Amino acid sequence: MTEAEKTLSIYRHDMRHILTTLSGMISDGLYDEADHFIEKHIGPIEETSHAKWCEDGVLNSMFCAYFAEAKKRGIEIDAQIDLKRLSEDESAMFSIMCANAIENAIHAVSQLSDKRKFIRVRAVCFPKLMFSVGNPYEGNIKTNDEGVPVSGEEGHGIGILSILDYCEKNDAMYDFKIEDGWFSVRVAKR
């Protein structure tokens, strides 16, 4: 187990306890204490609350968090997002899928040696719920027979599997494009 995997494993274990404690504080109306608990145990909250990317609170929070992470890494974000409020279940599932795609893009762009560090994000809900993320990349991206990227590294490729799982469970189509140093993934509900 690598050091990063060990750290992540510990973090996941501890997070269950942190969230249980936090849930109890909120249930008891201890909002100030919960806020201080978050700052202490989860880390400083980014100053992203003023950014409004879309009307859906879950999706907006996800976009704010991942775009702030990209900014910290010196990555420019080109985003055009036009999403209305989704149902609670749809919002959660769509948010996880988008987060996986954006996280993969951040990881890929962070590896670039030149100054082409940017990510393009598009999301709309009309005529159908659609999402795309694209980014420059270096190196070779391996794909399977269906054109889906695959990773030979242990512990990598789970984000792609999550995107495929979202598509399967939500009657959505996906398309991965890899050409001329540009990688993109598009997901659209049928």
Give each language-model segment a name.
Residues 6-20, 29:
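Conserved phosphoacceptor histidine of two-component systems
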Residues 26, 91-114, 166:
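Conserved ATP-binding N-box helix of the HATPase_c
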Residues 36-43, 55-73:
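Short beta-to-alpha transition helix within the HATPase_c
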Residues 51, 77-98:
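Conserved short strand/loop->alpha-helix "switch" segment adjacent to the catalytic nucleotide/phosphoryl-transfer site
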Residues 116-127:
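Short beta-strand/loop element within the Bergerat-fold HATPase_c
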Residues 139, 178-186:
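Glycine-rich nucleotide-binding loop
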Residues 168-181:
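Glycine-rich ATP-binding loops of the HATPase_c
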